């Protein structure tokens, strides 16, 4: 068996609506489907889904880091902060040729916002 690509990223969240305010409303992911405590969001330009699963924290499980390609790191970072994200590393040009910010969402998951440096 070989891996052909990334299908979905599953993230546990304490509050589904609060998570949707960030991922759907601030970052622009689109809702594909949802049932009960789960909702799947489409990541534009890929076949990847971000699956938000509302449930209590599970002790001992590691967090997930998710990296999103955006058109404007600074604007996306500002929108994410307005929706409840916390800045870990402010937007900055990186030596590998990307502009990147690192944030945590309201549940403490790490997310990176990147775009090719100008």
Positions of the model-derived regions?
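Conserved short beta-strand elements that form part of the metal-binding/catalytic scaffold
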Residues: 30-62, 110-115
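Vicinal oxygen chelate
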Residues: 1-2, 77, 83-118
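Short amphipathic alpha-helices within nucleic acid-binding modules
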Residues: 22, 74-79
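Conserved catalytic-core motifs of GNAT/GCN5-like acyltransferases
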Residues: 10, 30-36, 92-94, 118
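Short hydrophobic/aromatic beta-strand element in the GNAT-like acyltransferase core
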Residues: 40, 49, 67, 88, ...
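N-terminal beta-strand motif that seeds the catalytic metal site of vicinal oxygen chelate
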Residues: 1-18, 47, 64-68, 114-118
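Amphipathic alpha-helical segments
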Residues: 15-30
């Amino acid at each position: 068996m070989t891996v052909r690509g990334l299908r979905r990223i599953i993230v546990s969240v304490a509050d589904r609506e609060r998570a949707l305010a960030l991922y759907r409303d601030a970052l622009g992911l689109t809702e594909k489907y949802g049932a009960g405590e789960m909702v799947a969001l489409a990541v534009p330009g890929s076949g990847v889904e971000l699956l938000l699963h509302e449930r209590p924290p599970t002790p001992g499980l590691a967090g997930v880091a998710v990296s999103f390609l955006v058109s404007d790191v600074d604007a996306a970072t500002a929108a994410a902060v307005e929706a409840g994200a916390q800045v870990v590393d402010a937007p900055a040009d990186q030596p590998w040729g990307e502009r990147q910010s690192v944030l945590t969402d309201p549940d403490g998951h790490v997310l990176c916002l990147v775009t090719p440096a100008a």
